[in-house]
Design a protein with these regions (language model features):
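Active-site C-terminal subdomain of aminotransferase-like
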Residues: 267-369, 373-376
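Conserved PLP-enzyme active-site core in the AAT-like
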Residues: 139-305, 370, 387, 392-395, ...
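Conserved C-terminal alpha-helix-loop-beta "cap" of PLP-dependent enzymes
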Residues: 349-434
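Compact, charge-rich alpha-helical regulatory domains located at protein termini
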Residues: 1-38
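N-terminal entrance/gating region of PLP-dependent enzymes' catalytic architecture
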Residues: 35-116
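Short loop-beta-helix segment that forms the pyridoxal 5′-phosphate
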Residues: 102-106, 122-142
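A common structural junction motif
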Residues: 399-406, 439-447
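General small-molecule cofactor/ligand-binding pocket signal
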Residues: 130, 181-185, 374, 405
Length: 448
């Protein structure tokens, strides 16, 4: 077998003959012997295509994904059912391989998808303008920080510790780039953002306040008072939202939130080891020209026919770099298409029914586990509990083919014994009861 499939021995012989070289050694004659490797590389022997396929399959078989076990892990990425309709459309060649629709006259299908996606996100969030997607949730949060900096030029960003840790880290990274700093606000004893601490942190130097609904622990926040406290000095209020909870929760726009962002993986995109997915971004109309990415718009041509165009293109490849608000490329458009198809498949009633189903199963699971809740208040799809023997629970559950949830101690030292448990429509009551049996073996008496 040839070492490289792209150049066989006869190929190399022909190339050497063409340049008048007798051997490969002749090509390296100018390189001193004392710096040349005089042995074969320490690499395994080459494989045929079939051998490579079999080897990779054996490696992949060692993984235990959501299809090989019952998973209650969430923490921002969730095991939702992806209907066949979604991938039957996203895998069509017309959508699978396009680039930015620079020529709208031949890209009407792709542009209409962007427009319909923006419309759906605006309706979900209760905000009038949306872009055509960003990379994922955390960078969408961070991009909102940049918008706030463009808007008021203040130097401080205030973030609740209820915001996803990855989002807070990404926000801090972006903030260093545009000369801001991030100040974090703690959670109260019930796992919600501490309103008094938030009010104390917001001052005349605050550019924006970042919240999450539901927050990372699954707590449904009281957005009204939090948004009011955030905006009392003229700061922007940014809220990261879980789109599939908006069938049962009020949209952030109704609370006076300026920018709503979020992770789109739950909308028709598989877990896929954490990506790719897409981020969404909606805002009040006054921020339209400072929003990141592309915005598709509806228009009419010279003959009065309905058409679609890229109305705003504020990425650095389209305008002067110093005027750009983002470097987003076309990479997430296919994932956003999946999100649009999924929302159309659900419909207005479907998203309500799904939210209600998740809420019922979440409350049933919290009661069935019987463990001390970290956040005893309202929850929709996720809740946090303290586990007396967390290692024991995880070990026993994993041996039974159950992933019991996400260890909170990774991100919250104060919850070293905490477990974050997520529910979707794929988790049945039988699955919950199976986890509850493991919880019963480690359960301590919970105070009344």
């Amino acid at each position: 077998m040839s070492r490289y499939t792209s150049a066989t021995d006869p190929d190399r012989r022909a190339m050497l003959d063409a340049i008048g070289a007798g051997s490969l050694e002749d090509l390296f004659a100018d390189i001193p012997e004392d710096v040349r490797l005089d042995r074969e590389l320490d690499l395994p022997a080459g494989m045929s295509e079939q051998e490579v396929t079999d080897h990779l399959a054996s490696l992949a078989a060692r993984n235990r994904g959501a299809d090989q076990e019952v998973t209650f892990a969430g923490a921002g990425m969730y095991d939702h059912y992806v209907p066949a309709l979604v991938e039957s459309i996203t895998q069509r060649s017309e959508f699978l391989t396009p680039y930015t629709p620079y020529q709208p006259e031949i890209s009407q299908g792709g542009l209409q998808v962007m427009f319909e996606f923006q419309t759906a996100i605006s309706e979900l969030t209760g905000l009038p303008v949306s872009n055509a997607s960003l990379y994922e949730g955390p960078s969408s949060v961070a991009s909102a920080g940049y918008l706030a900096n463009l808007e008021n030029g203040r130097g401080k960003l205030v973030a609740s510790r209820g915001v996803h840790p990855h989002s807070r880290e990404t926000l801090a990274t972006y903030a260093r780039g545009f000369g801001s700093r991030v100040e974090e606000v703690p959670l109260d004893d019930d796992g919600a953002t501490d309103l008094e601490a938030l009010a104390a942190a917001v001052d005349d130097e605050t550019s924006a306040v970042f919240l999450q609904q539901p927050n990372f622990l699954g707590t449904v926040e009281e957005l009204g008072p939090l948004a009011e406290a955030a905006k009392r000095t003229g700061a922007l209020c940014v809220c990261a939202v879980d789109p599939l909870t908006l069938g049962v929760l009020r949209p952030p726009g109704e609370y006076g939130v300026d920018v709503a962002v979020g992770e789109g993986q739950t909308l028709g995109n598989r877990l896929d080891f954490g990506g790719p997915s897409f981020g969404f971004y909606a805002a009040a109309e006054r921020y339209l020209r400072k929003m990141p990415g592309r915005i598709a718009g509806e228009t009419v041509d010279v003959d009065g026919r309905r058409g679609f165009v890229l109305t705003l293109q504020t990425r650095e490849q389209h305008i002067r770099r110093e005027k750009a608000t983002h470097n987003i490329c076309t990479s997430q458009a296919l994932n956003a298409l999946g999100g649009m198809v999924y929302l159309a498949w659900l419909g207005r009633r479907g998203i309500v029914e799904l939210g209600e189903l998740m809420a019922r199963r979440t409350h049933y699971a919290r009661a069935a586990l019987g463990l001390e809740p970290i956040n005893p208040g309202p929850v929709v799809r996720e809740f946090a509990v303290r586990v007396p023997d967390l290692d024991g629970l995880v070990e026993a559950a994993r041996a039974d083919g159950v992933n019991p949830g996400y260890r909170l101690g990774r991100d919250y030292p104060e919850y070293a014994d905490g477990l974050l448990v997520a529910l979707t429509e794929r988790r049945t009551r039988a699955d919950i009861d199976r986890l509850a049996r493991h919880a019963a073996t480690v359960r301590a008496e919970v105070p009344a």
